Each structure stands twice: as C-alpha cells, then as structure tokens.
Amino acid sequence: MLTLLHLLSAVALLVWGTHIVRTGVMRVFGARLRTVLSRSVEKKPLAFCAGIGVTALVQSSNATTLLVTSFVAQDLVALTPALVIVLGADVGTALMARILTFDLSWLSPLLIFIGVIFFLGRKQSRAGQLGRVGIGLGLILLALELIVQAVTPITQANGVQVIFASLTGDIMLDALIGAMFAIISYSSLAAVLLTATLTAAGIISFPVALCLVIGANLGSGLLAMLNNSAANAAARRVALGSLLFKLIGSLVILPFVHPLANLMDELSLPKSELVIYFHVFYNLVRCLAMVPFAELMARFCKRIIRDEPELDTHLKPKHLDVSALDTPTLALANAAREVLRIGDAMEQMMEGLKKVMHGEPREEKALRKLADDVNVLYTAIKLYLARMPKDELAAEESRRWAEIIEMALNLEQASDIIERMGSEIADKSLAARRAFSEEGLKELDALYDQLLSNLQLAMSVFFSGDVTSARRLRRSKHRFRILNRRYSHAHVDRLHQQNVQSIETSSLHLGLLGDMKRLNSLFCSVAYSVLEQPDQDEERGEY
C-alpha cells in the first residue's frame, strides 16, 4: 500500500511540476505566446509549428488547447487553424516526453536549487518567474525518477503480474486501459512513462505497450473534452475535433499494432526506449496526416455542436479569458477592457436619463435593464480578479488590480444612482404631470453635458493612465462642483420668486443636483489613482 501511495504521489508531483512550469512560462512569456498563436493562423504550417513550440514551452498540450479554445470562444481564431494548432500541440508534448525521459537525474537537483534561489530572491520579477520554471522542470525530472522507482516493486508483486498478464489479446481493451491511465494520472506523459517502465520490467508485452500508448493519447483527448464541457459551443468544438482526430488515429493504427511491434522488435534498442519513440512518431505521423483534413473536421464539428440560442438578453462579459489568469498583465488588460464596456453602458444610461428628464418615461425601463447589465459585468470582473494570485503580483500589477476593481465598483454604484434618478423623475414629475421650469431644465442639461464629458474623460484616463488627462479631469471635477453649487443657489432664487414649476419640482430638482454631484465624484475618482495625490482621500470624500 505504501508503495502504491509513493507511485500516486510521484504522479501528482509530475502534474504539479507541469503546472508550475506552465504558470511561470505564462507569466513571463504569456502575452508573446498568445501573439504567436493568434498570428500563426494564416497558414497551416505556421499554425502547426506554433502548436509545437508553445507546447514545448508550457509542457502541456492541454494548456495549449486551453489557450486556443479561449481564442475560438472569443472569435479571435477560426476553428480550422485552431484544430491545426492543437495537432501541433500533440506533437510538441510527444517530443517533450522524449526529452524528459533521457537520463537527466543530475539536472533535477540543480534546477530546483537554482530555481529556489531566483524565486525566493526576486519572487515578483521576471527572474523570479524563470526560477519558478526551473523549479517546475526539476520537479518533473524528479517525479519521473520517482515513478520508475515506485513502479519497480509494484511490478514484482504476483497480483499485479497476473493483472497485466491478462492484457495480451484484446487491442481495444488494452487501448481503453491506456486511456484510463491517462485520465487517472491527468497526464498522458505519466501514462506513457508508466507503460515504458512496465515494458522494461517484462510485465507487459511490447504489443500491449503500444496499445496502452495509443490509448493514453486518446485519454488526453477525453481530458480536454471534460475540461471544456462547461465552455461555450465554439470552445467545445475545438476539444471535440481534437478528440475525433485522436480517435480516428487510434482506429487506424490499432489493427497494425502486432505487425508494427514485430517490425520494431528488430531494432537494437531497449523496449522502454522503443515505447517512447513509438509515442513520438505515432503522434508526428498522425498529426501530419490529419492537417489536410482540419477544415473538413471543423465543418463536421460545427454540425455536431451547434450554436446555442441566446436566451439571456443581458450583456455578458466578452474579454474575461480564464486561461489568461496565469499572465497577470494580460488578465488585467482583459479586466480593463471589460470595465470599458461598463463605461459604454454608462454612456447609454446617461443618454436614457436625459430622455427621461425631457419627458420620455419609456426610457426608464431601459435604464433598469442597463443597470442590470452593469451589475452582471461588475460581478464577473470582481470574480475574475478574485481568482488572480494577488500575493504574487508585482507592485505595479497590484496597483492596477486595485484601480480596476475600484473603477468597476464606482461605475456600478453610479449605475444604481442613475437608475434611481430615472425612477424618481418618472414617479415625481412625469406621473404627477409636473415639469421642470425652463431655466431649471437648462441648468440640468448643462450639468448633464458636463457630467457626460467627465465620464468619457474618466474612461480615457482609466485606460491610458495619462497624467495630463488626469489633471484635466481633476480640474473638470472642481468646475462641475462650482457649477452645481451655482445652480443650487439659482433654484433657491426661483423659489423666492414664487416660480410655480420650481416649487412643484423643488425636492426632485435638488435631489437630482445632489445625485449628479455624487456621480461626478464617482466618475472622477480615477484621476487621483493616476496622480496619487496626498490629498486624494479628502477630495474623494467631498460630495
């Protein structure tokens, strides 16, 4: 039992090492890798090579598939080139399996030692993340060595020998067991290595080993399908296409396993080495043969998985790519783009508010819907940012993280205020057949125009971080407050003059002035984040 636990822990260490390498590479080169993938879609050979290269870096075809599916889900990459990239990823992971199974036991402690020094010394820097990659590679090599050590006593047990001795006849059953190995270990590499070790120990025959390798490849396709089961239709098509390619390859090669085994037996190499080489060349030949059929497979997948009908009319997040969370700069940029979409919705709310002020009560319903849309986007941004490893962010990234969440919160609060303003105008003015005085409506329009201008400038400052624009926004905030105070006094003067319309709408009018003042403060608060003024808190607190 203890030996089995050692094997399971070694497999877990292999998966964890792969995760650490992927995380480190994505944080250092994530944006560049995405650029490579997105720009390699014009020609199939480029897409194929991009899949190989990216997978070699991130140590996982599943990670590359996740990146590609996120692109397809956002309509950044078409399905056909995405399938070609995934085929390249399968070749890349097979090549890395060959490299990692060389005798590199001396390299493991060196990589871990140097990696820890860099990672702990400069954790949030580029060098620190490269140290993380070194730790991950060292753990992978250590895990591979531990797997070999753990399997050896297991293979000597009589019960295990009896179980594996039964794997001699049914090639389909052998392939399914290989797929099960890959799913249980969450890694086709671990399954292939286990197969090679069992072959070297003489526990399983060489033909059975080839079937297990073929099944392990199929299992990795099933894993990708399971990982994307909750994704949208576009992302599921990529996973389905990858699985079908592997299924077709398995069905084609399985009948020829015994002739291939007899042919490879003539090579003067250890059986364990032959298993690894078969894994490499099988994936290489299969993927190269499938590339010309990528477009046909894309059409088939679109027929099988159709676009889902849009039942929910609410605005939905478009840029919150989960696979970008390992690349903080990219994830923050995605969240910022989503905040800009909230800004667009806020502009629509401002336009609707003006229509309500001018006697169009139907717009009040549209304001409620837009407020719900803003809340949906704000919640999505908040949850997305909460999934980022905030403790590992660099100082600048941490500041930007706080800036994004604060801006999203301010806009969400502003949307609630605008929704309430529209409702109060409809209830107190339009329903009661009361109208603002001509002078009062002009003043509200002037404040509205200034407020809309400040909102647009605030979104520009938020996205660009331009100091000059931030200073201009701060000045605009002060001008708005002066104008708001002047119009409040003007309204009181009209009350002294016994203006009937002003008297009837007085509480509503003054309430709108106060709400606009609060909106202005919420919009303009981003200026202080950029300028980092010492009197920031004092200025923000004044409404």
Curated annotation (Swiss-Prot):
The membrane-spanning stretches of this chain are 1-21, 76-96, 99-119, 134-154, 175-195, 196-216, 238-258, 274-294
User: Which family, according to UniProt?
Assistant: Belongs to the YjbB family.
GO BP annotations of the record are: sodium-dependent phosphate transport
Where is this protein localized, as stated in its record? Answer: Cell inner membrane
User: Could you tell me the membrane topology recorded for this protein?
Assistant: Multi-pass membrane protein
GO terms for cellular component:
plasma membrane
Disulphide bonds annotated for this chain are none
**Lineage top rank: taxon:** Bacteria
The protein's organism comes out as Salmonella typhimurium (strain LT2 / SGSC1412 / ATCC 700720)
InterPro entries assigned to the protein according to its UniProt record, in alphabetical order: Na/Pi_transpt, NaPi_cotrn-rel/YqeW-like, PhoU-like_sf
The alphabetical list of record keywords is: Cell inner membrane, Cell membrane, Membrane, Phosphate transport, Transmembrane, Transmembrane helix, Transport
Q: What is this protein called?
A: Putative inorganic phosphate export protein YjbB
Function, as annotated, reads: Might be involved in phosphate export.
Q: Which GO terms describe its molecular function?
A: sodium:phosphate symporter activity
Q: Which reaction does it catalyse?
A: phosphate(in) = phosphate(out)
